[in-house]
């Protein structure tokens, strides 16, 4: 970054352009508060990744957990993932949309996934009191506006297993929507569900 005609190099431990924008915003705030720029940069360089935010949990294939649950969030994470996807690998997006929440974003997110992923798996993400199949059908409306290839697997655990079983070593799998959450809300009940644990258990069967 350049501050008052002087160039500074910042080495981040975080991935994605959205992390760059966040760091630039933090530095701008630090400058406005009169803080030392070099000390601020050193502090930012020491910050590790945030749990559930572009969190790489395994490699070959890369499996990344991210909280992206809005159109903007999904677009940003898929663009960041595309940057690290090998030329002979596929970008696979597994996602759903929350129940009893804004339903207008569902087709929008379907369209984004269809355009930016090589393959999508549409599944459940805290359906709450809504019918998960109905939520998925609304997502499909947007997906069908694209040429994107996709599969519907309502049960999220089964969807993750399918993604892992069919991925090749150079593929990148994005598990979008839950991030750091350790539960799945079905009806009015919270069920234990940590995607990291689901992935580890499946790979170590």
Model features per residue range: what roles?
Residues 1-9:
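Acidic-glycine-rich active-site phosphate/pyrophosphate-binding loop
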Residues 18-19, 52:
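C-terminal accessory "lid"/substrate-recognition subdomains
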């Amino acid at each position: 970054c350049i501050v008052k005609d002087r160039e500074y190099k910042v080495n981040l431990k975080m991935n994605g352009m959205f992390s760059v924008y966040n760091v630039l915003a933090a530095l701008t705030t630090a400058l406005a508060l009169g803080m030392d720029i070099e000390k601020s940069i050193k502090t930012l360089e020491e910050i590790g990744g945030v749990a559930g935010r572009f969190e790489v949990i395994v490699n070959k294939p890369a499996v990344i957990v991210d909280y992206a649950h809005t159109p903007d969030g999904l677009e940003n994470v898929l663009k960041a993932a595309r940057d690290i996807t090998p030329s002979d690998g596929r970008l696979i997006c597994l996602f759903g949309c929350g129940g009893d929440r804004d339903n207008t974003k569902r087709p929008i997110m379907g369209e984004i996934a269809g355009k930016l992923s090589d393959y999508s798996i549409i599944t459940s993400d805290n359906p709450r009191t809504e019918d998960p199949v109905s939520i998925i059908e609304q997502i499909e409306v947007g997906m069908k506006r694209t040429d994107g290839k996709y599969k519907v697997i309502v049960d999220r655990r089964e969807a993750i297993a399918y993604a892992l079983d069919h991925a090749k070593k150079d593929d990148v799998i994005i598990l979008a929507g839950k991030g750091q959450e350790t539960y799945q809300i079905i009806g009015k009940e919270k069920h234990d569900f940590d995607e990291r644990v689901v992935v580890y258990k499946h790979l170590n069967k």
